[in-house]
Amino acid sequence: MIIDAHTHIFPPSVNEDRDAYLQRDTTFRELYSNSKARVATAEELLASMDEAGIDKSVACGFGWSDAELCREHNDYLLETAERSGGRLIPFCTLQPADKAARDDLKRWSARGARGLGELRPMSQGYSLIDSDEADLLSWAGDAYDLVLMFHASEPVGHAYPGKAGLPVEQLGRFITDFPGVSVIGAHWGGGLPFYALIPEMRDAMGRTYVDSAATGLLYSPDVFSRVIDLVGASHVLFGSDFPLVGQSEALEALRDVPLDEEARALIEGENARELLRLADG
């Protein structure tokens, strides 16, 4: 089973009235003010999966600052996932500072949400260190068995729109504070795997994964072997970051990486299947 653990879809209204959404959210404006920045629907994702030979995809929300935009987006994610016959796995978006967040989480979980993401604490205006928002997110992970996906930012290298998301020090602190919560550090965790060499970090990272989303835009292909050496293939998830990167392109790039058969199977889908408690086949 091949599972893309990191894709994004939006309701059709977002593309149809993009200017209105650009005015309502600073981070959306940063990422999508360029008309060439693609906004994809569920139908486009499913067509891409068919073309690439991908069985299932995690369909992520966007880190809106406005809780009402989160709700609007999540309704679409959950409705389209339900219609997909299990091919789309919904990760809802959340503004944890909103007073109705706990009620929203209960409702979304009942409708089939499997995780929260891609969360962007910096642009959404909260910290993961000693904060009510961190406590709420850990509670959501425990209470509803939700996987938390964070947009983790590498602290060095070139700048690009939307880079700010979550500094690696905050991600590391959240993991050590709440080691029982399942976490995905997107984009190779912003360098998090290196810190698995610290014994107390390694001890806390048993339920922590990193994904390969947008690898070709950030790292050389050697990142796969280096991260496997640091945390093991069992903690790496294949992710494309569709539609920013095409799924066929991302999968072909992964298959160009020399991996043993077991590591390839884990990264291409077995890790995600186990993490998300999906049935075989």
Locate each region found by the language model:
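Active-site gating/metal-coordination segments in enzymes
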Residues: 55-56, 64-156, 218
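Catalytic pocket-lining loop regions of alpha/beta-barrel enzymes
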Residues: 114-115, 127-237
